[in-house]
From Swiss-Prot:
Pfam families: Aminotran_5. The keyword Iron-sulfur applies. This is Cysteine desulfurase. InterPro entries: Aminotrans_V_dom, Cysteine_dSase, PyrdxlP-dep_Trfase, PyrdxlP-dep_Trfase_major, PyrdxlP-dep_Trfase_small. It comes from the Bacteria. It catalyses: (sulfur carrier)-H + L-cysteine = (sulfur carrier)-SH + L-alanine. PANTHER family: CYSTEINE DESULFURASE, CYSTEINE DESULFURYLASE FAMILY MEMBER. Its cofactor is pyridoxal 5'-phosphate. Belongs to the class-V pyridoxal-phosphate-dependent aminotransferase family. NifS/IscS subfamily. Residues 230-253 are annotated as: Disordered. GO terms for molecular function: cysteine desulfurase activity; iron-sulfur cluster binding; metal ion binding. The modification N6-(pyridoxal phosphate)lysine is found at residue 205.
């Protein structure tokens, strides 16, 4: 618990680890040189960059630190992975993704389809958020596919996709495979012995600073820089990035890796305990695959109440959670993930995501559970008792 209360929105961002912050501070006041400079100040910072890349490579079990490209954030990394591949394979005009991707991928695919003439195959999911593998195998992979961009685990429900199987199928079809973001540091991964070609890791979701992201690019992969200019990042991404963050983004990933087993066991136990009691509240259910999702994520859909009302109730109790993705929380429409899963209209507006971290305590979870019964009051004034379901949302969840 912090001075502001209980923070259960760790899939949106995390608190910077105090040790990470302590190691960053000298890089603002002492080792502040431009790493492109030839003098000692620049060389010292360049060394910090290499250490960050080595730590990031280790967290993903990459073979070489040269496979790590630092960017400004997840959106840039996702855009870079897709646009670089399309430029490297100009004759291929198809893209494969899923209907539950982050807006950073979906919005770009929409643009490429409408403005650039690409064909985009969007693979659906079932009511637990599991990818439709038959559709993926049947219609999505052909010689015209340049890239497959599918998240390792969903940021709203935590449902984990069979990434290695998907990547192997893409590789057999001659397509580049791009994945990750939310799953990094939460579940084991080893890209060295994987068919994954590109992988995104977000520092601020690993108790490292915001504005720092890493894109893994497998050695030997065709890569075309999207941000052009200087020779930084081995000429793959121009511009002087946030150097202190580069060092500690890798450090945050390394710390997450060290704590992964113990943390996941404890966090998963808290999540399961919370989910069991939350599910006992009338007219609510846990979304996503109960047996195969991120250990820190619990998304509960409450029927007959808006997500905003739930978040306000929690906020009054000094509990921070979210309704859907942080990047779309300003929208009044149901989450595209809930719609894709067929969550009924009476509940599609009321999903509440509780995302835990290694700092979350069992006492905090108990406090959340005590607050949840207050949802019943909000239901009594909700308009969703009588509204009809819009097109694309099934009336029942089965």
């Amino acid at each position: 618990m912090t001075a502001q209360g209980i923070y259960l929105d760790n899939n949106a961002t995390t608190r910077v680890d105090p040790d990470v912050l302590a190691e960053m501070l000298p890089l603002f006041t002492e080792q502040f040189g431009n790493p492109s400079s030839m003098h000692g100040f620049g060389a010292a910072v360049g060394g910090q960059d290499r250490m960050g890349a080595q730590a990031g490579a280790g967290a993903a079990r990459a073979a070489h630190d040269s496979e790590i490209v630092f960017t400004s954030g997840g959106t840039e990394s996702d855009n870079t992975a897709i646009l670089s591949t399309l430029e490297a394979y100009p004759k291929k005009k198809s893209i494969v993704t899923s209907v539950v991707e982050h807006p950073a991928v979906l919005a770009l695919c929409d643009y490429l389809e409408k403005k650039r003439g690409y064909t985009v195959h969007r693979i659906g999911v079932d009511n637990r958020g599991n990818l439709d593998l038959d559709a993926y195998k049947r219609c999505a992979l052909g010689p015209d596919v340049a890239i497959v961009s599918i998240m390792w685990a969903n940021n709203e429900t935590g449902t984990i996709f069979p990434i290695e199987e998907l990547a192997q199928l893409a590789k057999a079809a001659g397509a580049v495979f791009h994945t990750a973001v939310q799953a990094v540091g939460k579940i084991p991964m080893n890209v060295r012995h994987s068919a994954v070609d590109m992988l995104c890791a977000c520092g601020h979701k690993l108790h490292a600073p915001k504005g720092v992201h890493a894109l893994y690019v497998k050695r030997g992969l065709r890569f075309r820089p999207i941000v052009r200019g200087g020779h930084q990042e081995r000429s793959r991404r121009a511009g002087n990035g946030e150097r202190a963050g580069h060092r500690r983004a890798g450090g945050g990933a390394h710390v997450a890796l060290m704590h992964m087993t113990d943390e996941n066991t404890r966090v998963k136990r808290s999540r399961q305990a919370g989910a069991a009691i939350l599910a006992a509240v009338p007219n609510c259910f846990v979304t996503g695959n109960p047996a195969n999702r991120l250990p820190n994520t619990c998304n509960v859909a409450f029927e007959y109440i808006e997500g905003e009302a739930i978040l306000l109730l929690l906020n009054e109790a000094d509990i921070a959670a979210s309704s859907g993705s942080a990047c779309t929380s300003g929208s009044l429409e149901p989450s595209h993930v809930m719609r894709a899963m067929g969550v009924p209209y009476t509940a599609a507006h009321g999903p509440t995501r509780l995302s835990l971290s290694r700092e979350t305590t069992e006492e905090e979870i108990d406090r959340v559970i005590r607050v949840v019964p207050g949802m019943r009051t909000g239901r009594s004034v909700s308009p969703y008792w009588s509204q009809a379901a819009p097109e694309g949302v099934r009336p029942v969840y089965s």
